[in-house]
């Protein structure tokens, strides 16, 4: 397995171009299964999960190629099962189920894998599809969906806010008969992006980005060209990199309007922030960040995918900061690794209390999930001495060329190839 070797400490300063959003590109690629004509998807990041998704679409019978953009032609899809071999590494594969049953009347997806972050049940996806008229069975480790004829529009009230299930229901409902209303829908920018992609193909969707989405079913979806929005979590990660190292960064090709909660907390931590239409600059003017209190929440609240990075910020900040995780259980697995580097913290249930220290020390640490692994790499950049981050395949699932971008900010980081 590959690992990163990071020599610190470094004040990270420079300019970074942000890639397309993984959490929008994945559902958009799966939603391309709904289209009877070719689609071109631009600004798709180069990530392990994207490669897996493209391979999966190919196994279903779609023609998929990448030459800058990703081109998907699902007109000849003739396989309706997403097998365990591909699905085992990636939770997002559940997004194949809705488009398959909506367009072809049947679909099977092996129960998915992915990051080890507590319970992420597929129950809400299943319940939503059942309310649209699908019959669902769980057999031999597979979720099997079928419907006679077409799915039927329904008034669906989500039991809890779920990004993944909102996308599944919205995508499937585009080809249902009649009108579907999703109440208590998730509001994340990636849902808006997926809706806009579907609208480009001819879907009739309104209200995406609010807690009530309305979908008027259509007979078919055609082709089109769509550009994926910038990755707000990658943007936030590089902003934190500059903040914890008392440095400066300009993030280009990003969307400041998707990061209001994160920018507010960075300003509270003492960062000097400026924004334009497609850029954000952060300058610490050489000052240590101040500890902040963070509580994760569904959008437009503070994103859970920035929690690990802000845990690190608090652990090197001036003062004591409290972080409460309300979205996922078991999402503080990075904290014991940071304690190995000299951080002071206590975990109490879904809260971590961070006592800021002046410096961290390099150590051998292990990545446990995508965002946790990013925080360990950033910690290595500011720690005294050498940090080795193991199991970085987690990072490759969600960050496009993170070491190259950190090097542009001055980091001394090297990828050591595994056997």
Curated annotation (Swiss-Prot):
The UniProt record lists the EC number as 2.5.1.7
Chain positions with 2-(S-cysteinyl)pyruvic acid O-phosphothioketal modification: 115
Q: Which reaction does it catalyse?
A: phosphoenolpyruvate + UDP-N-acetyl-alpha-D-glucosamine = UDP-N-acetyl-3-O-(1-carboxyvinyl)-alpha-D-glucosamine + phosphate
For the ligand (UDP-N-acetyl-alpha-D-glucosamine), the binding residues are 91, 120-124, 160-163, 305, 327
- Enzyme class, broadest EC rank: transferase
Q: Name one GO molecular function term.
A: UDP-N-acetylglucosamine 1-carboxyvinyltransferase activity
Q: Where does phosphoenolpyruvate bind?
A: 22-23
This protein's GO cellular component annotations are: cytoplasm
Subcellular location field: Cytoplasm
- By its UniProt entry, which InterPro entries does this protein fall under? Enolpyruvate_Tfrase_dom, Enolpyruvate_Tfrase_sf, MurA_subfamily, RNA3'P_cycl/enolpyr_Trfase_a/b, UDP_GlcNAc_COvinyl_MurA
Tell me the active site: 115 (proton donor)
Q: Which domain of life is it from?
A: Bacteria
HAMAP family tied to this protein: MurA
Q: Which family does it belong to?
A: Belongs to the EPSP synthase family. MurA subfamily.
Task: Describe the task this protein carries out.
Answer: Cell wall formation. Adds enolpyruvyl to UDP-N-acetylglucosamine.
Q: What is this protein called?
A: UDP-N-acetylglucosamine 1-carboxyvinyltransferase
The species is Sodalis glossinidius (strain morsitans)
């Amino acid at each position: 397995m590959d690992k990163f070797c990071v020599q610190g400490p470094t004040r990270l300063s420079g300019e970074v171009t942000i890639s397309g959003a993984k959490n929008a590109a994945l559902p958009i690629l799966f939603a391309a299964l709904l289209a009877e004509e070719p689609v071109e998807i631009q600004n798709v990041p180069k990530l392990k999960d994207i490669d897996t998704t493209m391979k999966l679409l190919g196994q279903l019978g779609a023609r998929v190629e990448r030459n800058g953009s990703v081109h998907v032609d699902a007109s000849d899809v003739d396989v309706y099962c997403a097998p365990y071999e591909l699905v085992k590494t990636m939770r997002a594969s559940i997004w194949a189920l809705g488009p398959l049953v909506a367009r072809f009347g049947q679909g099977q997806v092996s129960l998915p894998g992915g990051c080890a972050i507590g319970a992420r049940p597929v129950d809400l996806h299943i319940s939503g599809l059942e309310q649209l008229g699908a019959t669902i069975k769980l057999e031999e480790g597979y979720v099997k969906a079928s419907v006679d004829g077409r799915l039927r529009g329904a008034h669906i009230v989500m039991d809890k806010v779920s990004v993944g299930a909102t996308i599944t229901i919205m995508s499937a409902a585009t080809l249902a008969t009649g009108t579907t209303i999703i109440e208590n829908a998730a509001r994340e920018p990636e849902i808006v992006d997926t809706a806009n992609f579907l609208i480009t193909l001819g879907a009739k969707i309104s209200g995406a980005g609010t807690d009530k989405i309305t979908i008027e079913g259509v007979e078919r979806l055609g082709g089109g060209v769509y550009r994926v929005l910038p990755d707000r979590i990658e943007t936030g990660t590089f902003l934190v990199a500059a903040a914890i190292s008392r440095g400066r960064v300009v993030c280009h090709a990003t969307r400041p309007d998707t990061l209001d909660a994160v920018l507010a907390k960075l300003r509270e931590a003492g960062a000097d922030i400026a924004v334009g239409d497609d850029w954000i600059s952060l300058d610490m003017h050489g000052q240590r960040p101040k500890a902040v209190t963070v509580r994760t929440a569904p959008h437009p609240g503070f994103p859970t995918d920035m929690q690990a990075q802000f845990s690190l910020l608090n652990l090197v900040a001036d003062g004591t900061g409290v972080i409460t995780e309300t979205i996922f259980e078991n999402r503080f697995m990075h904290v014991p690794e940071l304690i190995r580097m000299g951080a002071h913290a206590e975990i109490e249930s879904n809260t971590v209390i961070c006592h800021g220290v002046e410096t961290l020390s390099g150590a051998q640490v292990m990545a446990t999930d995508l965002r946790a692994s990013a925080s360990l790499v950033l910690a290595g950049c500011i720690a005294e001495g050498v940090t080795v981050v193991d199991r970085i395949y987690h990072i490759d699932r969600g960050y496009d060329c993170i070491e190259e971008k950190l090097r542009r900010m001055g980091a001394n980081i090297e990828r050591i190839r595994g056997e």
